[in-house]
Amino acid sequence: MDRTQTLIENIRLFKDIEKNKEIIRNILPVKESFDIIEKNIIIGSEKAYMVFIDGFVKDDIMLRILEALLPIEETEITIGELIHQKIPYIEVETFTDFKLMQKMVLSGAVALLVDGQDQGILIDAREYPVRSPEEPDLEKVTRGSRDGLVETIIFNTALIRRRLRDPNLIFEIKSIGKRSQTDVVIAYLKDFVDNKK
């Protein structure tokens, strides 16, 4: 178990959303990996924060949830009220510790935190990327899963993250080629890479 995992083992959410965001940015590579998305919103009069992995979340469900949350005008709203009255989705639960949040976000759920609340909401709006059952032609002799990559970068990063739910997995996106400006993703495990080069 690495140092970061040990640090979050017993840490519960704070009521201060800025403290929570700081811890989340330490346990998930939000600023380093382009596929981990954070979104700041306002619910009623309170600051709120969402974090999720691009490629796992069903866009239409998230759009409906945001359409339900953004018009809220109540100045004080509890997590219970949000879950039972405002979020139009079935697969919703609360969480109070960062370890569960990290595990669920890396598995594809959306974490929602609201300022002033010491518990958050996990929205299971996952849609795992899937391919047809045929295996790639060139890899018939290899062991393990038979996932093959496709032309879409987000789909490919989600396929990899589905198999490797490690917070140290980083995807960096770059554009290469003078004229083609092709998007290329470099994937690596932060705790194995040689940072000297």
Where are these regions (language model features)?
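Membrane-embedded alpha-helical signal segments
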Residues: 1-197
